[in-house]
A protein has these predicted regions:
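A conserved short coil-to-beta-strand element within the FAD-binding core of flavoproteins
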Residues: 130-143
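An anion/pyrophosphate-binding glycine-rich loop and adjacent beta-alpha core
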Residues: 37-45, 59-60, 95, 187-190, ...
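Glycine-rich FAD pyrophosphate-binding loop
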Residues: 24-48
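A glycine-rich dinucleotide-binding beta-alpha-beta segment and adjacent secondary-structure elements
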Residues: 130-133, 308-388
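Glycine-rich active-site loop/strand segments that organize a redox cofactor
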Residues: 50-98
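Short hydrophobic core segments
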Residues: 8-10, 33, 134, 154-169, ...
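Core beta-strand elements of the Rossmann-like FAD/NAD(P) dinucleotide-binding domain
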Residues: 3-5, 149-158, 231-232
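N-terminal Rossmann-like FAD-binding beta1-loop-alpha1 element of flavoenzymes
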Residues: 5-32, 406-411
Length: 413
């Protein structure tokens, strides 16, 4: 009689559910330990609650979008590609759609549908999901033999750590996986926030808080090298602490070592108009308001909350009449609108980041199996590993792919 291998998975997020279900399908007896009462808490908030579950691209393009340890992921992504992910969800009855930037979402636009699909997949595969908190690994002779939790002790032939990072602690990502990994002797690369809002000492940000800019162009410039480290077109938001929104979160992942006032944001408020056409547009607006104060001539050109900050930077008296604005003053205004700058002071705390940069050192993990090189039977998957990507579905794909690979290999007798 064949005895199935016992596998314990710590964490029922994207990586954990995929790892557990895969191990069960390969014949293992699987227990998934989750400290929250509901699985997939972090999946629920991804993509603004819509769940950007993958990026519909080839493997090389995918790796190019992983600035931290992308090469480590070749085996995992090749074994379970973005195309495989899409086919997987479609086969489970979850219809998907591909939007701008090859971002894949459920047709329903509901992240709960992704969570429910993964939960059902794990349960139907034979996984037992228990609500408990893992406190320590049980190690013996260089191998892991179980997990000691608050309520019970679970013995196993293999253990997969899928606890996530340290961002969004309300979802359960409180850094538990790093503690367990350190207990096993693993090195933890220092943790930093990634996909996180910027802080700014510019007082005008607070004046503009709540202002959402759409269809603007953004450049993040390193003042030391004078080069742009990021540029894009899209949406951003001013807040009481600085800047947030889709482009800002994406930009943050391109800055590995944030230093106060080293980086500056350059915002083109009118990217659809070149300098000449913008100047002509402003001329027309001033003609329509020729006898009015210049401060009252921007209602058609700019959102209300940014008018005063622009006027202050321009330096022209607010009560100067439009018909007395000089060509030089008009050109100076165009320059401000084409390059509205905001100094960047730093990142918001890691607890507010979408993902955690840093984690278990990849050189201590076998990339072909996700097994620890230090402790036999110990595996890692998902955000706990020191791999993070740009926004656009890449980070969830890392979770699916590493979870799949870890689950498969953990089940082998």
């Amino acid at each position: 009689m064949m005895i199935s291998k016992k596998v314990v998975v710590i964490g029922a997020g994207a990586a954990g559910l995929m790892a557990g279900a895969t191990a069960a399908l390969y014949g293992a007896s699987v227990t998934i330990i989750e400290k929250n009462k509901r699985v997939g808490r972090k999946i629920m908030i991804t993509g603004k609650g819509r769940c950007n579950l993958a990026n519909n691209c080839d493997v090389q393009t995918f790796i190019n979008n992983v600035p931290v340890n992308g090469r480590f992921l070749y085996s995992a992504i090749n074994a379970f590609t973005p195309e495989d992910t899409i086919e997987f969800f479609e086969s489970k009855g979850l219809k998907t759609k591909t939007e701008r930037g090859n971002r894949v979402f459920p047709v329903s636009d509901k992240s709960v549908d992704v969570v429910d699909t993964m939960h059902d997949y794990a349960v139907e595969s034979g996984c037992k999901i228990v609500c408990d908190t893992a406190n320590a690994l049980i190690l013996e002779d260089g191998a892991v033999i179980g997990v000691k939790c608050e309520e019970n002790t679970y013995y196993a032939d293999s253990v997969i750590i899928c606890c996530g990072g340290k961002s969004y602690p309300l979802t359960g990502s409180t850094g538990d996986g790093y503690t367990l990994a350190k207990q096993a002797g693993h090195t933890i690369v220092p943790l930093k926030p990634s996909l996180v809002p910027f802080t700014s000492a510019d007082k005008q940000c607070k004046d503009m808080q709540g202002l959402a800019l759409k269809n603007v162009a953004l450049r993040i410039v390193d003042k030391n090298s004078k080069k742009a480290v990021y540029s894009d077109f899209g949406e951003m938001l001013f807040t009481h602490f600085g800047m947030s929104g889709p482009m800002i979160l994406s930009a943050s992942s391109h800055i590995r070592d944030i230093q106060p006032d080293r980086y500056i944001a350059e915002i083109d408020l009118k990217p659809a108009l070149d300098f000449e056409h913008l100047d002509r547009r402003i001329q027309n607006d001033f003609k329509e308001n020729s006898n009015r104060d210049v401060s009252n001539a921007f209602s058609k050109l700019l959102p209300r909350k940014i008018i005063v900050p622009v006027l202050k930077r321009w330096g022209v008296p607010f009560d100067k009449k439009c018909n007395s604005i000089t060509k030089e003053e008009r050109h100076a205004l165009c320059e401000i609108l084409k390059c509205f700058t905001v100094e960047i002071s730093g990142f918001r705390p890691i607890e507010e980041a979408i993902i955690t940069s840093g984690g278990v050192k990849t050189s201590e993990i076998n990339p072909k199996t996700m097994e620890s090189k230090l402790v036999s039977g110990l595996y890692f998957a998902g955000e706990v590993i020191d791999c993070d990507a740009y926004t656009g579905g890449f980070n969830l794909q890392i979770a699916w792919s590493t979870g799949r690979l870890a689950g498969e290999n953990s089940a082998y007798i």
